[in-house]
């Protein structure tokens, strides 16, 4: 079986300040293979639970080039302005960009779960279930695309 590779969407952007929590920012560094696995596993675990189930949901995997692009966006950390498409096109593929902001450090799983929880306000084939709710983080994470 051929393992399909889905480039990690630029969904891994945490803009945080140091808080009073016991979680240290060093514990969240994406250079740590354990953190990379946490991010990928959380995405893949949640993507398997979408309803209705996807017929061709690709498995996400870590990509260092895309991670570096996400890092550059996080260093800019402007929640009001996403990176221009030209700045997040990698290998001819336009990557999405989700932000998670917190006043204190949170785990990657917490941030990814918060994006996924937008599913409560989204109905497949219809869209947002009411005006003014945020669903774009969820729909971007769960959207399937052809092989790269």
Curated annotation (Swiss-Prot):
Q: Which InterPro entries match?
A: CAP_dom, CAP_sf, CRISP-related
Modification(s) after translation: Contains 8 disulfide bonds.
Protein location: Secreted
Q: Where are the transmembrane segments?
A: none
- Entry annotated with the keyword Disulfide bond: yes
Under Pfam families, the record lists: CAP
Q: In which tissues is it expressed?
A: Expressed by the venom gland.
Renumbered to this chain, the signal peptide range is 1-22
According to the lineage, what is the superkingdom? Answer: Eukaryota
- UniProt keyword terms in alphabetical order: Calcium channel impairing toxin, Disulfide bond, Ion channel impairing toxin, Neurotoxin, Potassium channel impairing toxin, Secreted, Signal, Toxin
GO function terms (MF aspect) = calcium channel regulator activity; potassium channel regulator activity; toxin activity
- GO terms under cellular component: extracellular region
Indicate whether ATP-binding appears among the record's keywords.
no
The UniProt record lists the SCP domain at 41-140
Q: Which PANTHER family match?
A: CYSTEINE-RICH SECRETORY PROTEIN-RELATED
Q: Which family does it belong to?
A: Belongs to the CRISP family.
Function, please?
Blocks ryanodine receptors, and potassium channels.
User: What's this protein's name?
Assistant: Cysteine-rich venom protein VAR6
Instruction: List the source organism.
Output: Varanus acanthurus
Taxonomic placement? Eukaryota, Metazoa, Chordata, Craniata, Vertebrata
